């Protein structure tokens, strides 16, 4: 689904091509190692790493983000939650590296028992206008996408271009191997919004990660009591095509998974900002219920941006 790499700290300096290449190699090595080793060994290694980072305070931005969810100062975020959050984040990557080698049909049958709210998706497709599934970066959204392909066929999503191009292509190939249709956010033959609209008008499913867009194109919303910006794409697609906008959430349940599709948001007003706020409210409820599984290691709120960055947003 869109991006899926929000926690990465990839270099932006064009002179750092060596570092970018090393990053690509590191992910390639991780992919091979995780597939080659027994599951219990990989799980223990990832969990040990999570506990180590948690004991040393964990990523500062993750702590700040969880503080907003809990409504406490960053220093008051419980250490067990930090540890659980890092373990959840590591589990996501562990499963990403293994997912292409797993029997998808067998796994989909297992997931059939834990996915709720499918009647909302079925109703949307029965109406013939398509469906937009909007999700935050929580749990394992790639696993949910794999299930969707097995039960409803290929869906369409969008991916940000990473650098180096080889790393970007590695993740595109990975998601296409799961049956996703992945459009580049930039540099494609056609604008992604145009293609997504076309897919919806053909009664297809579009899936978008939708809780963060700290750019001038994002719309300002209230999120856990503070202002941030979220992408307008999901709401705009629903308004312009008539597709159902279905908030969706993924989380982990023990060693299993939880997935829930929620009722379609009311988009009849055509007010993209108001619809996006309603989506933000739904996300907030779901993230608060499963805070450890929200994998947001980058700044989420405007207050965490530099003053110069905030000034750029205000100059729109």
UniProtKB/Swiss-Prot annotation:
Pfam annotation, one family: Lip_A_acyltrans
Alphabetical keyword list: Acyltransferase, Cell inner membrane, Cell membrane, Lipid biosynthesis, Lipid metabolism, Membrane, Phospholipid biosynthesis, Phospholipid metabolism, Transferase, Virulence
Keyword Zinc: no
Principal cellular location given in the protein's record: membrane
GO cellular component: membrane; plasma membrane
GO BP annotations, alphabetical order: glycolipid biosynthetic process; phosphatidylinositol metabolic process; phospholipid biosynthetic process
InterPro entries the record matches: LipA_acyltrans (IPR004960)
Reactions listed under catalytic activity: a 2,6-O-bis(alpha-D-mannopyranosyl)-1-phosphatidyl-1D-myo-inositol + an acyl-CoA = a 2-O-(alpha-D-mannosyl)-6-O-(6-O-acyl-alpha-D-mannosyl)-1-phosphatidyl-1D-myo-inositol + CoA; a 1,2-diacyl-sn-glycero-3-phospho-[alpha-D-mannopyranosyl-(1<->6)-D-myo-inositol] + an acyl-CoA = a 1,2-diacyl-sn-glycero-3-phospho-[alpha-D-6-acyl-mannopyranosyl-(1<->6)-D-myo-inositol] + CoA
Similarity annotation: Belongs to the LpxL/LpxM/LpxP family.
Active site: residue positions: 137, 211
UniProt protein name: Phosphatidylinositol mannoside acyltransferase
Membrane topology field: Peripheral membrane protein
Species of origin: Mycobacterium tuberculosis (strain ATCC 25618 / H37Rv)
This protein's pathway: Phospholipid metabolism; phosphatidylinositol metabolism
Binding site for hexadecanoyl-CoA: 137, 175, 240
Protein's job: Catalyzes the transfer of a palmitoyl moiety from palmitoyl-CoA to the 6-position of the mannose ring linked to the 2-position of myo-inositol in phosphatidyl-myo-inositol monomannoside (PIM1) or dimannoside (PIM2). Essential for growth and survival in axenic cultures and during macrophage infection and in a mouse model of infection.
Observed phenotype of the null mutant: Essential, gene silencing is bactericidal. Depletion of PatA causes a block in the biosynthesis of PIMs, resulting in severe changes in the composition of the mycobacterial cell wall membrane, which correlates with the loss of viability.
Subcellular location(s) of the protein: Cell inner membrane
Membrane-crossing segments per the record: none
EC number per UniProt: 2.3.1.265
Gene Ontology MF terms: acyltransferase activity
Domain of life, source organism: Bacteria
EC class name: transferase
